[in-house]
């Protein structure tokens, strides 16, 4: 992790960029300069760490979580492409948008598998609930 500072204590920031010209609705990781939350160092040379080629192909509102039993890391994000997408607007996106979350997994925060879709409207019997969208997920 040559992009990371040498201090073993730091904060990790998972985020997306809103970029109407570059279609940057992809996921980025930054690490704080030690325990200073005012200075951030981008992972991966300012390039996204994960992107989506499924669903709407845009990902926003990411959340990162670690499974303490397996040590596996997960990034879970909203499946929504605003820029370069359908130009539907907030009403359309909030009432008739994707009910999928996009998921990646990694053993080390450097090597990611995925993406895969998780449809939160699907019931155990395979039928679907009437939902308008799935946004800004967080996990415990």
Language-model features: locations:
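Beta-rich carbohydrate-recognition and catalytic domains
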Residues: 1-136, 140
């Amino acid at each position: 992790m040559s992009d990371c500072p040498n201090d073993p204590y730091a904060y990790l920031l998972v985020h997306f960029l809103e970029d109407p010209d570059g279609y940057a609705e992809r996921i980025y990781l930054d690490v704080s300069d030690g325990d200073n939350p005012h200075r951030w160092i981008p992972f991966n040379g300012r390039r996204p760490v994960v992107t989506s080629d499924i669903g709407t192909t845009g990902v926003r509102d990411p959340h990162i979580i670690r499974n303490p039993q397996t040590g596996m890391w997960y990034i879970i994000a909203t499946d929504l492409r605003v820029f370069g997408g359908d130009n539907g607007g907030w009403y359309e996106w909030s009432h008739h948008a994707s009910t999928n979350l996009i998921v990646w997994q990694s053993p080390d925060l450097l090597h990611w598998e995925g993406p895969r879709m998780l449809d939160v409207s699907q019931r155990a019997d395979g039928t679907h609930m009437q939902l308008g969208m799935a946004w800004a997920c967080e996990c415990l």
